[in-house]
């Protein structure tokens, strides 16, 4: 039986990043900075709203100008703004904004599903999820426009080449 399931643009690019080990060539903090730049230059122009302050909050957090409590406050404001949006494009852009204000996205390293035994006889295990930054970012930008995933891939490659 032939597999006819279509692979999403975000999944295609995730696979390329994994195969080419691109994310292993940069630090996590560089990855986050690249994501923020990409959002600012490629995604915000697609919106009818002024969104620059959101990225400024993320940068201020990275540069330790604001603390964890402030970034949570700004993320909550972004979620509230999302609830007032009606256009799907604006909602998808706001999803990216919320991700860029996410404390774990701004601070955590790439991680995946992990299963930990909470029972000494391994009878029962509990699955924990920690934000897996690269696939999540690709998924959200792919929801705006699948072409953005390829653009991000190229943007990353240029960054690494010029590093």
Describe the function of each predicted region.
Residues 1-163:
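Structured binding/interaction patches within domain cores
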